[in-house]
Design a protein with these regions (language model features):
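Bacterial Sec-dependent N-terminal signal peptides
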Residues: 1-27
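Start-of-domain marker
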Residues: 18-79
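Thioredoxin-like thiol-disulfide oxidoreductase module
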Residues: 152-182
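A short, hydrophobic beta-strand/beta-hairpin element that forms part of a small beta-sheet core
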Residues: 183-198
């Protein structure tokens, strides 16, 4: 009888521990205001492309975040000097700083352009897209974007097309891109330190519009 009772207790403990583990590992979903929502709600909102899904505060949490953020940095001059040292470029203190940020290889930035180095047509598509991006920025603010990366993985397709620079002291990441947003992101900083950042994959027109706003 004691043996049967002991076996029964052990089985209960095993089941309890297993249930607790499953509960802890279950993914929980939150909106941009940290309000918990269902998985279906999360996916439906994310599918609109107005918000991005990012890791939450815990390993099994996923959170939605707005794609655009506006703010102000305290010392633009210090950022200028840091970027000039890292890139060997001379920045105009009266013009906006436009930064394209590559976080590292992911399924978003290794998809559409994944094999574009394989033939001249694909290379030309990349060259044309970024050429148009730079032409638009130049028309709006007479400046050029700076290409900054956190992790160089996934940049091979830009060889001979764009020059990328390592994020100096992780400054750009800390100031503007604290999470790994899928694809690439950008930020435009005005002469006064005001900025507009946009998280995740973007169209050229978003960069042009932000540059125009920050050039006032």
């Amino acid at each position: 009888m004691k043996k049967v009772l002991l076996t029964f207790i052990i089985e209960i403990l095993i089941f309890s521990c297993s249930g607790t583990k499953i509960g802890k590992n279950k993914t929980r979903y939150f909106d941009e205001n940290n309000v918990e929502i269902s998985k279906s709600q999360f996916n439906r909102i994310r599918s609109t492309n107005k918000l991005l899904g990012i890791p939450g505060d815990s390993i099994n949490h996923k959170k939605l975040t707005l794609r655009e953020k506006r703010g102000k940095i305290n010392n633009r001059k210090s950022l200028e000097l840091l970027l000039e040292k890292a890139t060997n470029l001379e920045l105009d203190s009266l013009k906006p700083i436009v930064i394209i940020f590559h976080p590292g290889k992911d399924k978003n930035n290794s998809g559409a352009f994944k094999n574009y180095k394989s033939n001249s047509y694909n290379i030309e598509r990349i060259r044309q897209w970024y050429g148009q991006l730079e032409d638009g920025i130049n028309q709006v603010a007479q400046t050029k974007p700076i290409y900054i990366y956190k992790d160089s993985s996934g940049l091979e397709k830009y060889d001979g097309i764009l020059t990328w620079y390592k994020d100096p002291e992780k400054t750009i990441e800390k100031l503007f891109f604290k999470h790994h947003y899928p694809g690439s992101s950008f930020v435009v900083i005005s002469k006064n330190g005001d900025y507009i950042s946009y998280f995740g994959e973007f169209g050229k027109e978003y960069v042009w519009e932000a540059t125009q706003i920050m050039n006032k």
